[in-house]
Amino acid sequence: MGKEQELLEAARTGNVGLVEKLLSGKKGLLGSGSGSIPLPGLLSMWRGLNVNCVDGSGYTPLHHASLNGHRDVVLKLLQFEASTNVSDSKGCFPLHLAAWRGDVDIVQILIHHGPSHSRVNEQNLEKETALHCAAQYGHSEVVRVLLQELTDPSMRNSRGETPLDLAALYGRLQVVRMLLTAHPNLMSCNTRKHTPLHLAARNGHYATVQVLLEADMDVNTQTEKGSALHEAALFGKMDVVQLLLDSGIDANIRDCQGRTALDILREHPSQKSQQIASLIHDYMMSDCDRGNFHEDLARHRPIPTPRTSIPSPVPSPSLRHKNDAVTGELSKLLNEIKICRDKDCSFEELCQTISSHSQSMESFGSGRLSDEERNGTLTRINKRPTPPLPPALEEEEKSCGPSGLWEALTPCNGCRNLGFSQDKRCVEIAHSPSLDVFLPEDEDNPYESVATAVTRKPCSLDINLHNACPRNGHFSHVSVSDAERGNHGDDSTGLTPDCSPPSPDTALRNIERVIRPQPKQRTSLSSSQDVQKPLQNHSGDPSEVSSSLGYASFSTSPPASPPISPANCSTGSAEDYALTDEATYQKECIERDDRRNSHVPEQFAGLLHGSSPACESPDNPYQLYGKVRKFSVPEPPLRHGNFLRAPEYSPPFPRTGSEASALKTQREVKPQVVYRTIFHTRVNQGPVTFGEQVDKTTGVHARNGEARSNCTGGSSPANSNTGYEERACTLGRMRSMPKNVLDLQLSRNFSKSDSNLVAVSPIEEEQWGSRGQSSPGKSSPSRLERTPSFTAEWEEIDKIMSSIGAGIGTEMEGITEDHPGPRCPVQSVGQWLDNIGLVQYENHLLSNGFDNVQFMGSNVVEDQDLLEIGILNSAHRQRLLQAIRLLPRVRPIGYDGNNPTSVAEWLESLELGDYTKSFLINGYTSMELVKKIWEIELINVLKINLIGHRKRILASLGDRLHEDPPQKPPRAISLREPTGNHTPPQLSPSLSQAYPNAGSLDVQHLIMQADARRRRNDNYFEDVPRSKLERQMAQVSMQGEWCEPITLRPPNEATSSTPVQYWQHHPEKLIFQSCDYEAYYLGSMLVKELRGTESTHDACAKMRSTEQMKKIPTIVLSVSYKGVKFIDATNKNIIAEHEIRNISCAAQDPEDLSTFAYITKDLKSSHHYCHVFTAFDVNLAYEIILTLGQAFEVAYQLALQARKSGHGSSTLPESFDSKPSKPVPKPRGNIRKSMEQPSMDQKGHANVPWIVEPGQEAKRGANTKAMADAHVYYSGIQRM
């Protein structure tokens, strides 16, 4: 057997020469050229080595050579007839080992050479083929060769795994791709235990999961463990979870135990679990929103469905014919307007030209759609019948006076086409499927907007500005509210228009914008995904069509009951709704509450909305300002999508007596119809992705100035009858404002907005409007001039607008100072989140102290705070921050009259009165002390654990000029030396001992004591310490005389065995208080021979070996300069106390750095015991050891100081007395519990000032070797 062992070793090491020498007596089959074998040769073969000999593991020389990659040895062995089909003790063949190694050459040799060829589908004892071995370890070339040799990739091992399963499990991306390419059917060969997707998701192989999903593997494939989401969530693979969610996985799939992925995460609470649960929760909420989007809105508040959700209707041939006819008629009109412009025709001639064409176009509009065509196009879209328009509305609209192209010709600052339809076509068009709700040119009648616009007189409009800026750009919204919607249809039918006539150039440009919208604007329209919530008429169906960049907007709200009485509008009504893409689930109950709060009947809510959007051109930005005066009636603030706006009021515009009389006559003879027009125009829109837009539509909000005029005693005669008053507005007179002034105005608006959302207050509108007229009852002469010379008039208007624009910037700055920011209504955090569509984060905010919207301004809540409390979605955080910027900022102390005189008053102003007792108990008894507080004191001293409350307190304190925070080494504290009592004062007792009835603590008594201390020392606040410990030192310093300061040696000088240069705590912490640590107490061991750290190491090793055999208690180690107290962690009872003088050594266990021990001496028996503890982590054990060393150093320096002062041993601290104050624990954890409280009449020399060497605090966890060496010897204290 010796030679066989040599052969096996030679094959293992690759010694080809030795292999050939050992096998030379055996004639190779492949090398034989002779036909017959002589007898000596046969005898030699009989006596020769067996080439297939095996060792103890069943390996043949070919196994060894294949496993170790010796190609030449493999060839030599095969030449000497080595068999490739001999298995080892585990059933593995040489091919398995070569595939496991990934040696392609040897795999090919084993398959194609030798007397016997390897069988590629051979399985070992675990049912694994060579393909399993190669796939598991990612040997893609071996996999390719085996696949070419027709290896079966569907074979499973004993665990039911295919090669694809193993490749996915271990993230072998290239192998996965090869297997999927060669055998796509492998994805369907799954078991109930696992799939490749589950295995890849479990181990977090992001790329592998992505490849499997790209290969059309079903993302919702289930096993007994649930979906792949279950696996990824359970094993904390956040990126894979996100990938699966992005792929549309069903998060509601349950495993065999009926648990969803969220249920599993709740069973494993950890930070990673919370983060993954937040991702899944956000996904489920958004998925629910997408799934129920149209259904919920159709059920609760019918609005038009998005354009992309349905196919565009195909116009019928009759419609095309009508469209062509209208196109021809409009072309003629444009040509004649050009001729009028070239000839400089008068305004009257231009009106005649327009009127003649408007009548012909009106005929096309009246017969635009037959009933059958309507059913085939618009009605087919929403499948809801259109309610018939009330006869009163039809009659009113047919008697609306002379027609004219005012809406198209009036230079209304970008409003392309304003007006009304003449019949119920207006209501029917509201069912258009587009988001901006008007059909494009290839649907129905593209020119209806012009046909209806030329048949109506212009409406008196009130215009105000409000801006909304999405993240992807800025645009300005100008609200245009119909001032006559409350007049019940009493339009003035005089021929004189309310606004000055435009020039032919302006009229031509406006008409061209209507009928020839820019292609770029069409793209912007189709790409926007705004969701506009229309108001409802009395029948509950929407009757609004908003427009965008060239498309018309109509809205009618026929009345269903008598006009609103003045009593019902005592406080006004203001609602401003705009739905963002993720806020579609706002509750109807909130809407009803808002209506109830505004004292407006619900059925009339739609009549009080008059939204007006930004009428602004993308190429020439400018603004409109209405003539608005602030009203005296209070009004609730408005909700506007993602932000809150200040209330706006529209007071009545007085008219002359003749106008009022004419209006009164009309009211007596005409039926009263209330209607409104809503114009929506968007500016500078870009493509917006779902979930990233911020309120791109201007919501509807009620102006209702006419109704309020009667409530407050309007002066017009018309008020006495109906309570409604008409107003006039020179719509469009701002068009010629110099562009430089307008650009300056816009730049100021946007540059001063932290939140990119600008809300203009009514005061600004009042001031802007008042500059355009000398008095409320008079208009300047230029307003009423009607001259044929348009150039002269517009030049005069330019001068007026220039004078107005010159002071806009300064006015806005002044107003901004008076009104620092929009105020928010009194509402809960849940309501506020509901308004911005992120109600799912209510618990996140409330549980972390962000529980009051009045104290959640931008100086309190930051992006990092939102991230820390678990809001991981960056888009949601940005939306929250944008809404937070509109909340009121917390006013710092001393700002704007905010000067609280006491701590209690200050905390009550922050609605944090519950912390008053904690502040006073810990010495913060005045605002002077509070102003110097740091966040670390809020956490460690005051125990304010809620980050929202801490941020609220710090924001209230404002930007303070402080020294370095207290966590750094403090400055040298020079305490005064008042004369008087030479006896050192007592140490400050613990709070529970000093105030036994802390639950009913007299707060006023504490304040009186603090005041008395201040009266005893007039210089109390000259050098007020920053921390509670320093304040206690200041209190002690007023009662005794001190010796010279002392200096603590750094750790590396106090003992040579540690390289640490800085202590862990400030010395006063160990004198006036204690450092408390929780740890597991493993027990104690009798130390027969004191050998320093070797004794602690032995005890740690022994305790570790037995810690599994008993119940390990949790204790609190309270370390001070006196020693270490054992405190039961459950009931907080003091079990025992080890004096500092009796502790001789403390060290960490070199084998387990989280285990540490220290040796104490029992004075009664004079025996030493080693007490062993296990900390929760290595860093904590390191800190405890270092704190013990610092406690010894403080006690040592205090003892030296006492000896130098001449007090002798009688004045040494209590820890150096001869008798122990507490029993010492017995060996092996037999600890006696004692309820005896420590004596409070102890004498000590803790009342000594000191100077700490400047430097940084010790750094933890940096070097485990340093930690192991961070033990401290406590010797010499007994020799003093």
Swiss-Prot record:
GO terms for molecular function: ephrin receptor binding. GO terms for biological process: ephrin receptor signaling pathway. Residues 824-890, 898-963 form the SAM domain. The keyword Ligase does not apply. Its main location: cytoplasm. Pfam families: Ank_2, PID, SAM_1. The keyword Cytoplasm applies. Residues 520-550, 707-723, 770-782, 980-994 have a biased composition (Polar residues). GO terms for cellular component: cytosol. ANK repeats lie at residues 2-31, 57-86, 90-119, 126-155, 159-188, 192-221, 224-253. SUPFAM superfamilies: Ankyrin repeat, PH domain-like, SAM/Pointed domain. Keywords: ANK repeat, Cytoplasm, Repeat. CDD domains: PTB_Anks, SAM_AIDA1AB-like_repeat1, SAM_AIDA1AB-like_repeat2. It is found in: Cytoplasm. Residues 482-491 have a biased composition (Basic and acidic residues). This is Ankyrin repeat and sterile alpha motif domain-containing protein 1B. It comes from Danio rerio (Zebrafish).
